[in-house]
């Protein structure tokens, strides 16, 4: 996560977001993740940019809960020359989770199909923030949020009942896909969509 921006408006599917850092060398058509949801820049100025978002995407992500004036987590697409400081994040929302306990020990409830991809000390993305799983639970997970992360992202303001965008580690999905050929038919449980498909209004 690079910058904590702010939603200025949402009108007829057009988001306008105030920001500065993520606009460095930006160009029309480039991608910026908004709370973990990858969107395309369609217009920008010195301290703002705009993206179009469909009603389906809004309804299937935590963007449905964001209102003008709210803070939002922003991050540009990584380049080959950038340091990879966390795990690989694609900006493809796998599911929406619900906050059960706030920071510092953030607990999130997730759809049952997602729990198989969560492991202790594994990686998960919450509203675009790359985090390490502390406990993998039957119905979700917990992550430890340090004061710095709470202060420079939206996670510090999350309260029980709030919705968050979730993206699991893509490597887990690829491993599951590769191993499927070696699993006896009927044993594997349904999982989330395979990488590169569209599910729940978001590219996975």
Residue ranges and their predicted role:
Residues 1-204:
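Conserved loop->alpha-helix
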